[in-house]
C-alpha cells in the first residue's frame, strides 16, 4: 500500500490504539494515518482498497471499544477541526471537539447547543449518533451534512439525514464518513449561554470526570413508548423524563453499581457508567457489558443497546 506520497497525511506503524480511545484500551493498528485534508483522506482510503488492506475510520475515539489484538490494517483519523460562523449559521469540521463548537457558538451569542455541554467526543461522532442531553439533540440544529460515501463527496439536508433518538442515516451506512456539518442557530445572549453551559458542565464533570477512562453512558436510554407495557408499568413515574427511561434504572435493579471485573468497574454512583480503573482490557470490558445485558434480559425481557462501537 502506497501512502508515503500522499500530501498532508501523517502515517505511523504499529500504533497503539489505546492512545486514541477514551477508554485507554486497544491493541496496535498495523498502520495509522491522520489528516485534516479531505483529499488526503480519500486518497488513503483509495490506496487501502487498491491493495486489499482492511481500513477503519476513527475520530475522537470516545465511543470505541478496540480489541486487545488491535486492528490488522489501516486506521485513518480525519481531524479537520475548523469552525466558522456566518450570521446564525455555523460550519464545523468533523474533527472539531464538540465542546469547542459549543464554546464557539456560546461566545458569539448563538443559541441552541448550550445544553450539550460536556458531552465528550468530536462533531462527526455527535452527528453520527445524534448526541443529546437535557431534552435536546444536535440534530435540532443540523441543516446539512457533508460526507464521503466511499466514491464521492455528497451533501445531505436535515431530512435526508433521517435523525431519530441517538440515530441517523450515517449509523446505517458505516462506510459513509462525515466531513463537516452546517448548523443553524438562534440569536441569544452570550453570557447567559455560557452560564448555562458552565452549570451543566459542572454537573457532568462530577459524574464523568474528564480524566476518567470511560465513554460516558454505555447504554442507550429507552423511549417509554417502545417498552413492552408490562415492563413500562414497572418503572416509577418519577424515573421517566421527557418520555425516556434511563437505562441506568434497569441496570441498577440488576445490581450493576459497583460491579468489578479485572481492571473494569461500574461506578458505585451511576449504574450506566463503566470505566477503566487503570489496567483494564477490552476482553474484560466486553465481559462486563455482556453480563449486564444478560442480567437485564433475564429480569425484564428487554435488550439494553450499547452506544459504543466495537473494533476488532
Swiss-Prot record:
The pathway entry for this protein reads as: Cell wall biogenesis; peptidoglycan biosynthesis
Which UniProt keywords are present, listed alphabetically?
A: Cell cycle, Cell division, Cell shape, Cell wall biogenesis/degradation, Cytoplasm, FAD, Flavoprotein, NADP, Oxidoreductase, Peptidoglycan synthesis
Task: Report the enzyme's class at the first EC level.
Answer: oxidoreductase
In terms of one coarse class, where is the protein primarily found?
cytoplasm
* EC number(s) recorded for this UniProt protein: 1.3.1.98
What cellular component terms from Gene Ontology apply here?
Answer: cytosol
Active site (record annotation): 166, 217, 307
Q: Where in the cell is it found?
A: Cytoplasm
Keyword Cytoplasm in the entry? The reply is yes
Q: What are the required cofactors?
A: FAD
Q: Which residues form the FAD-binding PCMH-type domain?
A: 24-206
The cross-references to Pfam families, in alphabetical order and at most eight, read:
FAD_binding_4 (PF01565), MurB_C (PF02873)
| InterPro entries in the record | FAD-bd_PCMH (IPR016166), FAD-bd_PCMH-like_sf (IPR036318), FAD-bd_PCMH_sub1 (IPR016167), FAD-bd_PCMH_sub2 (IPR016169), MurB (IPR003170), MurB_C (IPR011601), MurB_C_sf (IPR036635), Oxid_FAD_bind_N (IPR006094)
Q: Which SUPFAM superfamilies match?
A: FAD-binding/transporter-associated domain-like, Uridine diphospho-N-Acetylenolpyruvylglucosamine reductase, MurB, C-terminal domain
Q: Does the keyword Cell division apply?
A: yes
List the Gene3D superfamilies hit by this protein, alphabetically: 3.30.465.10, UDP-N-acetylenolpyruvoylglucosamine reductase, C-terminal domain, Uridine Diphospho-n-acetylenolpyruvylglucosamine Reductase, domain 2
One biological process term from GO is: regulation of cell shape
What are the GO MF terms of this UniProt record?
A: FAD binding; UDP-N-acetylmuramate dehydrogenase activity
Per its record, the protein catalyses: UDP-N-acetyl-alpha-D-muramate + NADP(+) = UDP-N-acetyl-3-O-(1-carboxyvinyl)-alpha-D-glucosamine + NADPH + H(+)
- State the family named in the UniProt similarity comment for this chain: Belongs to the MurB family.
Q: What does this protein do?
A: Cell wall formation.
- Entries under PANTHER family matching the protein: UDP-N-ACETYLENOLPYRUVOYLGLUCOSAMINE REDUCTASE
Its recorded name reads UDP-N-acetylenolpyruvoylglucosamine reductase
